[in-house]
């Protein structure tokens, strides 16, 4: 695990993370099957995957649609998870480690201002803090 990844992680979170990191990208459906998150098996998949996303260990790379027998997509998209390093490249991710938190906050605010030009500073701060 990289420097960022050395924080404590519970066993189930670590299993999920390692499964995703080992494959590069992995559909939630396959993750649940591989790690026995089904009736009578492990519980709490959504809790673990949400915690990993909130801590920036994994993110949703895409939504993939199942296909019918004619090859047409149908239904809801299934989340495909990946690590940030897989999506954006190791160098880009590790380059952000050198920034101090205030600089990161300013960069986020600047980006949000470009996307939401009518928003006030207070509204943008609220978006960041949640």
Predicted regions and their residues:
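Single conserved hydrophobic/aromatic residue that forms the stacking wall/gate
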Residues: 1-11
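Short acidic, glycine/Ser/Thr-rich loop/turn "cap" segments at secondary-structure junctions
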Residues: 12-38, 91-94
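Short, leucine-enriched amphipathic alpha-helices that occur as contiguous helical runs
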Residues: 12-17, 28, 45, 101-109, ...
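Surface-exposed cap/loop segments at beta↔alpha junctions
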Residues: 16, 60-63, 76
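Short, well-ordered alpha-helical packing segments
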Residues: 17, 21, 32, 46-49, ...
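Short acidic, hydrophobic short linear motifs in intrinsically disordered regions
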Residues: 22-36, 108-110, 114-130
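Short amphipathic alpha-helical interaction segments
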Residues: 38-54, 60
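Short, amphipathic alpha-helical interaction segments positioned at domain boundaries
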Residues: 67-114
């Amino acid at each position: 695990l990289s420097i960022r990844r050395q924080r404590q992680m519970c066993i189930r979170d670590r299993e999920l993370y390692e499964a995703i990191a080992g494959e590069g990208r992995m559909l939630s459906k396959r993750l649940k099957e591989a790690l026995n998150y089904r009736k009578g098996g492990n519980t709490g998949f959504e809790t673990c995957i949400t915690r990993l996303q909130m801590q920036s260990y994994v993110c949703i790379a895409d939504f993939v649609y199942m296909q019918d027998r004619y090859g047409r997509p149908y239904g809801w998209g299934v989340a495909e998870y990946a690590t940030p390093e897989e999506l954006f490249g190791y160098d880009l991710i590790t380059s952000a480690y050198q920034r101090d938190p205030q600089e990161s906050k300013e960069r986020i605010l600047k980006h949000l201002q470009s996307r939401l030009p009518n928003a006030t500073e207070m509204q943008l701060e609220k978006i960041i803090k949640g």
